[in-house]
């Protein structure tokens, strides 16, 4: 079991015009051969939308129950979304549905689920360092922690490794993304790590519960 509720709630910021997205998804890697014949290796279950840490904890048990029922994972969108921008994007999608009725289903599938991703709040964005399975090597992981320590990143467990999360603005003690990227590149080169084993990501979902 992987439970990141307590860590993630401390990363949330309160803004009356914004909300966070939680997606519950089945992953093929959690089902051995059951997904082998499917074209898509992920299956969407449902979304939750919360405005603050209290709302997140209020639905915690519901999220856990659904994950257990479907052997699914709950993912949390690190960057908050703007309510007005979401409504504006939804109007655009619905207009496309009316104008292109013959392609309505394709338009819906392609665009509707992606609406929140286009409607960021515009505040300081969160970035995270994705560390994959090979870093279960304790000595290597501790070496990486030492390299990342100056950036004061929050450490969050993942199914195959760990994530280090921080804000991307330089002011007020937030991280310098360019410097962080250079640090990761140097570490990869020195330790012969592949790019996908150690990545700097943005606007991504992070595992809330599994």
Language-model features: locations:
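Signature for HUH/AEP ssDNA processing cores
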Residues: 1-159, 169, 178, 204-210
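A generic structural motif
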Residues: 152-161, 193-199
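C-terminal polymerase-core module
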Residues: 186-210
């Amino acid at each position: 079991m992987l439970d990141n509720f307590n860590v993630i709630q401390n990363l949330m910021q309160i803004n009356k015009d914004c909300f966070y997205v939680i997606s519950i998804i089945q992953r093929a890697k959690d089902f051995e051969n059951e997904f082998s014949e499917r074209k898509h290796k992920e299956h969407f279950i449902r979304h939750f939308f919360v405005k603050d840490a209290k709302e997140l904890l209020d639905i915690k048990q519901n999220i856990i129950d659904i994950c257990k029922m479907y052997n699914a994972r709950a993912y949390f969108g690190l960057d908050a979304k703007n309510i007005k921008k979401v409504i504006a994007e939804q109007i655009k999608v619905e207009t496309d549905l009316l104008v292109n009725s013959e392609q309505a289903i394709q338009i819906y599938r392609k665009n509707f689920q992606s609406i929140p991703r286009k409607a960021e709040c515009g505040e300081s964005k969160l970035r995270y360092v994705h560390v994959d399975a090979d870093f279960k090597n304790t000595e290597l992981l501790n070496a990486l922690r030492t390299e990342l320590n100056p950036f004061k990143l929050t450490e969050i467990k993942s199914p195959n490794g760990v994530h280090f999360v921080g804000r991307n603005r330089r002011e007020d003690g937030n991280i310098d993304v360019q410097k962080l990227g250079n640090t990761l590149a140097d570490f990869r080169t020195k330790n012969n790590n592949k790019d996908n084993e150690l990545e700097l990501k943005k606007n991504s979902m992070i595992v809330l519960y599994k």
